[in-house]
Amino acid sequence: MNFWDKIFLKGIKKFPYGSLQIEWPDGKFQKIDAIHKGPNAKLKIVDSNVVREIIQGGSIKFAELYISKRIITNNLTNLMHYCALNNDQAEETFKITIFRYLYNKYLHFKNKNTKIQAKKNISHHYDLGNQFYKYWLDKSMTYSSAIFNGKNDNLELAQNNKYQKLADLSSIKKGDNILEIGCGWGGFSEFLAKNYDCQITALTISREQFKFTTERMEKANLTSKVKVVFCDYRNIKGQFDKVLSIEMFEAVGREYWKTFFEKIKTILKPNGNVGLQLITIDDKIYNVYKNNPDFIQKYIFPGGMLPSVEVLKNIIENTSFRINSINSYSNDYAKTLNIWNKEFNRNWTKIEKLGFDERFKLLWNYYLSYCEGGFLSKNIDLKQINLKLN
């Protein structure tokens, strides 16, 4: 056992939750049990350089090693859950190097969400092709967490539940003039138009989503109610009774969080309100997270950033809003991600024919399991929030 292996084991033995069974490159097994119950994870280390690279490269390197098949596990979600539960101890064990610190600063700067860069960042993820997403999302083409009212709810019903809860939270009524910031593939706008007889302006900066949503409203005969606009939220004009947004705030970027709420304040009618669904990160890990881009920010959502609840509250209160209500749904997101992951893999043969390779498959498996583990551990949470002007 070399120097790096000893450091690695010393750190793992301090983890308080679950167990980790390691298969070393020489074929020997070693199991480390923590004091408290948790997921039972397995990790196969393929070559002798892996541990050194994990310690020197941190969580992003860990992801890259999985994608390159130099670490292997029989249950990726269990491993991600194990890592997330023991996040505090992992941060203490695998200290950040000055090179990683400077590189992280560069990544944040490079992906800063200016109006031009925001389009590039969104395109990086959402313009992989509508057919790609069709193969593993539900029929409503909803790419955000569902809410399961009962254990027998299928994904499509649970997505409808989510729409209904946010509409109720936002007091949507017939005749409202609504702005949806980040409309995705149009599921929520269609739901509102059909169920509330509203006028909706649906914003997107994804070319693929703009095309799909425009065609969707034409097919549903809803063009008189839903106006799909290719526009950055910072450029929108008008006055709205309600401003709604589902999991778009995560793409705004920390430098523009205040701008987001300041802009909404200028377009919201005096008695209007705001309904948001968004992901938050635990306050206790926010400070480390905000300075160190993770796997998601490097490979999946460049320019993205999650707020903590306290940070979010401070920004909201400093922009003349107040939180009227807030609800949490972390377990629902974990279940949604689990379903997506299964559907992604079940349909991989079709996805592969679109031109995606094995590395892409492993990247997306890691992404979906990484997020599921985060929600299971409660390091990240899903919130539905209603805001009103003071």
Can you say where each PLM-predicted feature lies in the sequence?
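Conserved SAM-binding loop
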Residues: T213-T214
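Conserved class I S-adenosyl-L-methionine
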Residues: K174-G182
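Conserved beta-strand signature within the Rossmann-like core of class I S-adenosyl-L-methionine
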Residues: N271-I279
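Feature captures hydrophobic
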Residues: M1-D153, L157-Q159, K165
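Substrate-binding/catalytic lobe of Class I Rossmann-like enzymes that use SAM or dcSAM, i.e.
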Residues: T280-N390
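A short acidic, Gly/Pro-enriched loop at the edge of an enzyme's catalytic core
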Residues: R234-V243
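A short glycine-rich, Lys/Arg-flanked "PGG" loop and its adjoining helix->strand segment in the class I
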Residues: K258-P270
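Conserved SAM-binding loop of SAM-dependent methyltransferases across substrates and taxa
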Residues: W185-Y196
